[in-house]
Amino acid sequence: MAKKIIGFIKLQIPAGAANPAPPVGPALGQKGVNIMEFCKQFNAKTQSEAGMITPVVITVYSDKSFTFVTKTPPAAVLLLKEAKLQKGSGEPNRNKVGTVSREQVRRIAELKMPDLNAFDLDGAEQMVMGTARSMGIIVED
């Protein structure tokens, strides 16, 4: 018989830097998951992408065991990295803070494709361009 799922936990954690401090500890502690075991497994799996924010979905089972799936970093984080910015604009419709090329947008869309609900690469590019626009980043052709 399959183990019964008692919940899902969605977190965004810096790759290779999970520790029992908030937000990881309290979220996992509520479900009774072994926090240190998760931290060790997550850090081992994501150490190659150190520093990037990595979304993770943790599935918790009735016997307090767990599995987790890591996703690609958020498009906003990838855009900030490509544009070499610290943060987006507070007023994106008035203040533009940086620019990215169409090739950079395509690269981000290719990386994000497994996690986006787009049928093709053009649709994924449009989603990434929309994220850039909402952050005050100009996309140049």
From Swiss-Prot:
One of its GO terms (biological process) is translation. Signal peptide: none annotated. One of its GO terms (cellular component) is cytosolic large ribosomal subunit. One or more lysine residues are methylated. One of its GO terms (molecular function) is large ribosomal subunit rRNA binding. It comes from the Bacteria. InterPro entries: Ribosomal_uL11, Ribosomal_uL11_bac-typ, Ribosomal_uL11_C, Ribosomal_uL11_C_sf, Ribosomal_uL11_N, Ribosomal_uL11_N_sf. Belongs to the universal ribosomal protein uL11 family. Part of the ribosomal stalk of the 50S ribosomal subunit. Interacts with L10 and the large rRNA to form the base of the stalk. L10 forms an elongated spine to which L12 dimers bind in a sequential fashion forming a multimeric L10(L12)X complex. HAMAP family: Ribosomal_uL11. Forms part of the ribosomal stalk which helps the ribosome interact with GTP-bound translation factors. This is Large ribosomal subunit protein uL11. The lineage of its organism: Bacteria, Pseudomonadati, Chlorobiota, Chlorobiia, Chlorobiales.
